[in-house]
């Protein structure tokens, strides 16, 4: 998906109002805290001009590093400044590989003035769908089905399916601090009997405007200004840039149909690409080499589940140990109110944001703003619990 969605609906200096569809100043713009560059990548995404050609995550990372080298050469005032990489959703796959590539080619990047300090992943796909979606799906369903108007009868049938598959109480059994070993995958688990998908169908039956991005959303559910509908993971051409074509030359964009999320994959479909999950490959090393890594997750996201992220972290080994040794239990405070829980160990911080969607900065801009301050070192960890 295009980073322009982030600019205009989440953390940019102006933000579209989803009711009036007018752009309004964003008091929680990340540009208040640091210099920001939003990048449409890989090639084939948004307004990017390059042709899709990547066949591995390493090639995605190499392409991005090449962009950075050109950018720093073109704008020499960037050279020597501290750099962080941030992104949400599928960027959870890209960012660890990009950071890993930069660290592995440190001499070239240091010479060019590129100094990476850390990464920030928001509701990211850094693990496989079994851990991120399927294993915690029954627990999520039990926590939210009443608020989503799903019937007791439907839930009973879903619970029976979860029992048969072996995930009915998976989180309760296996999410431990410290972990007791690698996570087991139930033998009965298969895509044709997906509890995750079955609950999604029940939610859509109960609420035509059900959004996997924000499970408590209600009607109406029109397209937003970026051509996105909360009920769908697809993007549509009815958006700001296509309906206001005079904007394109102002931002030096080509005169082409803009989609906030590409309908065609921006890289060649290869099985290898979809099995390169950072948690099993590069993420542990990136955490160890970075000054700070933050993983955020909105508790009301059903694209990826909050306890899927927790399970993934507890199944990952970095800096000499598997998972967190202590359970996340520190309160994140924003303006004197509880905004979530957080925990830090061995240069990794996990933050679970209350009542937040897949796009935390869109629905909960204040916590997102404070967490950026923490990433940048403008506040310390002990300040997260201060109003």
Give short role names for the model-derived ranges:
Residues 1-387:
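Terminal and linker regions of secretory-pathway proteins
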């Amino acid at each position: 998906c295009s980073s322009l969605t982030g600019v205009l609906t989440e953390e940019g200096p102006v933000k579209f109002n989803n009711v009036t569809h007018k752009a309004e100043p964003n008091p929680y713009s990340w540009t208040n805290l640091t210099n920001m560059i939003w990048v449409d990548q890989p090639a084939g995404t948004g307004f990017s001009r390059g042709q899709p050609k990547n066949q591995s995550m390493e090639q995605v990372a190499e392409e991005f590093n090449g962009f950075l080298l050109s950018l720093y050469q073109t704008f020499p005032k960037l050279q020597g400044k501290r750099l962080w990489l941030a992104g949400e959703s599928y960027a959870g796959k890209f960012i660890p590989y990009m950071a890993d590539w930069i660290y592995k080619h440190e001499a070239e990047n240091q010479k060019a003035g590129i100094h990476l300090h850390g990464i920030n992943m928001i509701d990211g796909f850094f693990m496989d769908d079994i851990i991120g979606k399927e294993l915690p799906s029954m627990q999520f369903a039990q926590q939210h089905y009443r608020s989503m108007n799903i019937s007791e009868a439907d839930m009973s049938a879903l619970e029976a399916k979860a029992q048969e598959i072996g995930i009915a109480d998976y989180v309760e059994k296996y999410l431990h601090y410290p972990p007791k070993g690698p996570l087991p995958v139930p033998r009965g688990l298969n895509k044709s009997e997906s509890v995750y998908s079955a609950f999604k169908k029940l939610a859509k039956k109960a609420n035509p405007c059900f959004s996997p991005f924000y499970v408590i959303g209600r009607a109406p559910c029109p397209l937003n200004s970026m051509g996105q509908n909360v009920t769908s993971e697809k993007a549509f051409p009815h958006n700001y840039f296509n309906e206001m074509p005079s904007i394109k030359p102002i931002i030096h964009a080509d005169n082409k149909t803009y989609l906030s999320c590409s309908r065609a994959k921006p890289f060649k479909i290869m099985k290898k690409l979809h099995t390169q999950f950072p948690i099993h490959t590069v993420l542990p090393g990136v955490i160890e080499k970075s000054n700070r890594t933050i993983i955020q997750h909105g508790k009301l996201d059903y694209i990826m589940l909050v306890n899927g992220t927790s399970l993934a972290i507890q199944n990952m080994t970095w800096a000499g140990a598997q998972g967190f040794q202590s359970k996340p239990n520190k309160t994140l405070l924003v303006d004197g109110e509880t905004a979530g829980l957080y925990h830090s160990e061995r240069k990794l911080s996990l933050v679970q944001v209350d009542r937040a969607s897949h796009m935390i900065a869109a629905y909960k801009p204040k916590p997102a703003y404070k967490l950026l301050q923490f990433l940048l070192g403008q506040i310390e960890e002990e300040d997260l619990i201060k109003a």
